[in-house]
Structures are given as C-alpha cells and as structure tokens.
Amino acid sequence: MADFDNLFDAAIARADETIRGYMGTSATITSGEQSGAVIRGVFDDPENISYAGQGVRVEGSSPSLFVRTDEVRQLRRGDTLTIGEENFWVDRVSPDDGGSCHLWLGRGVPPAVNRRR
C-alpha cells in the first residue's frame, strides 16, 4: 500500500482493500498489454436505474469495476475483459483516488472506431 500524507487517506485506502476483498469478483483481462492478468474488483452494473429525484446527480449508467490503480496501470481504452461469463471493454479509467480507481465499461466488444491498433 502506498504512503499517505495523513491518517484519513490511509484509513480510506485500507477500507477500499477490505471492500474489494469481501465484495470483489475476479475479472480476466483478455486483450492489451495486461492480457491474461486476473484482477479483483467490485463490479457495479446499474442496468435497472430509476429516474433520479430533484437535486440528484447521476454519474452514469455504465457498468464499472472498482479496482486497485496499481493493478490496471497499463490498461487502455478498448482493452477487453471478462467478468463471469460476460465480455466487457474499457471505455475509460478514472483518475487515481488514494490507490483506487474505477474502470468504466461497455458491454461486448468495443466499437471498431474505438479499438486499439
């Protein structure tokens, strides 16, 4: 685990590790520089979303995977991964936040215009 400037950030990072350990699932990276690697993260699939109330901001309705940033540093847009029996592609990787980040995913294979060369 990284060194932190304050106790709060260190506590949050420990909590994130615990959450991934208990609630996480395995994902296998199937293309790109990390092809074959297995990472662990908390998968969120908000496919059944109701309308938000007044004053509520919704970040997005795409599936995401909450992971350790160090485990996905070489992952790029268009790389693919499998969670369970379903295939996904990386739409974007959120900035590092205390050693963790979100992978925002698309279902299936990436559109041809987004594929890595």
From Swiss-Prot:
UniProt keywords, alphabetically: Host cytoplasm, Late protein, Viral capsid assembly, Viral release from host cell, Virion
Presence of keyword Protein biosynthesis: no
Alphabetized Pfam families for the sequence: Phage_attach
SUPFAM superfamilies, sorted: Phage tail proteins
One GO process term, biological-process aspect: virion assembly
Superkingdom assignment: Viruses
InterPro entries linked: Phage_Head-Tail_Connect_sf, Phage_tail_attach_FII
Compartment(s) where it occurs, according to its Swiss-Prot or TrEMBL record: Virion; Host cytoplasm
GO cellular component: host cell cytoplasm; virion component
Primary localization class, coarse: virion
Function: Plays a role in virion assembly by joining the head and the tail at the last step of morphogenesis. Six FII proteins probably bind protein W that closes the DNA-filled capsid, as well as the U tail terminator protein of the pre-assembled tail.
Self-association state and partner proteins as the record states: May bind head-to-tail joining protein W and protein U.
Name of the protein described by the UniProt record: Head-tail connector protein FII
Organism of provenance: Escherichia phage lambda
Lineage: Viruses, Duplodnaviria, Heunggongvirae, Uroviricota, Caudoviricetes
Name of the gene: FII
